[in-house]
Amino acid sequence: MKVFFVTHATSKDNEDKSASGWKDVELSELGLQQARERGETFKDIKLDLICCSDLKRAVHTVQIAFGQKYPVIVDKRLRELNYGDFNGKPREVVEGMKKERISEPFPNGESYEQAVGRIHDFCH
């Protein structure tokens, strides 16, 4: 079995240099184009299944890239890290906090260890 890991296309928060986390934001114009290009990249590869988070940026990337060509599992456990009170804050603020958040959750959010556990739960 081959597994491809692909991130969502560029979101409006990515362009604004915000740490989206669990903030549900749309793709930017660039992201819409990237999603179309992603579909082209995979056009000659047969996929059995696509899995993505339930956030708009992930779902829209899949919809634009692949349409209804493949079955899709949308699952909250595949979300990015929950920065809690820092969802949507400037990326530079969040970047400076990451090392201390490996085991210790972001306020009203989660730690990196918790995120890994959540994704591990999905995979098993």
Give, region by region, the residue ranges found by the protein language model.
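Active-site-proximal alpha-helix that buttresses catalytic centers in soluble enzyme cores
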Residues: 7-70, 110-119
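Phosphate-handling substructures
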Residues: 65-120
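Active-site neighborhood of phospho(di)ester-bond hydrolases with catalytic His/Asp-centered motifs
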Residues: 6-7, 75
